[in-house]
Amino acid sequence: MYAIVKTGGKQYKVAEGDFVKVEKIEGEPGSSVALTPILLVDGADVTTKAADLAKVSVTAEIVEAVKGPKIKILKYKNKTGYKKRQGHRQQLTVLKITGIK
C-alpha cells in the first residue's frame, strides 16, 4: 500500500517503513507528525475521491534534521569587474513513515 502526500510544495510517494527527506518541518526528533493533504492512496484499489481521502491518515516520525547539498550562486557582469558569490544549503527533515490508515 502506498500514498502520495504533499508537503513543502512537493509531492512524495510514500509507503510504510520508507525514509523520506522533505522540506523542514518543525518538531523534535522522535516526535510524530501527520502528513496532509493526501492526494492518492493505492491499496486494494486506487482512491482519489476527496471524501474517501478524508478518512485516510499518513503518520510519520521525525528521524533527524539535516542540510541539503551546497548550492553555489555566482553573479557576474562583463567588463565591469563585478562578481558576487553566494551559497545556500536548504534545511531538510528526514521522516520515517509509520502508518497509512
Curated annotation (Swiss-Prot):
Biological process per Gene Ontology, one example term:
translation
Annotated keywords: Ribonucleoprotein, Ribosomal protein, RNA-binding, rRNA-binding
**Signal peptide region:** none
GO CC, sorted alphabetically, is: cytoplasm; ribonucleoprotein complex; ribosome
List the GO molecular function terms.
Answer: rRNA binding; structural constituent of ribosome
Q: Which domain of life is it from?
A: Bacteria
The keyword Ribonucleoprotein belongs to this UniProt entry's keyword annotation: yes
Note the subunit structure.
Part of the 50S ribosomal subunit. Contacts protein L20.
> Which HAMAP family does this one have?
Ribosomal_bL21 (MF_01363)
What does this gene product do? This protein binds to 23S rRNA in the presence of protein L20.
What does the similarity note say? Belongs to the bacterial ribosomal protein bL21 family.
List the protein's name: Large ribosomal subunit protein bL21
Q: Which gene encodes it?
A: rplU
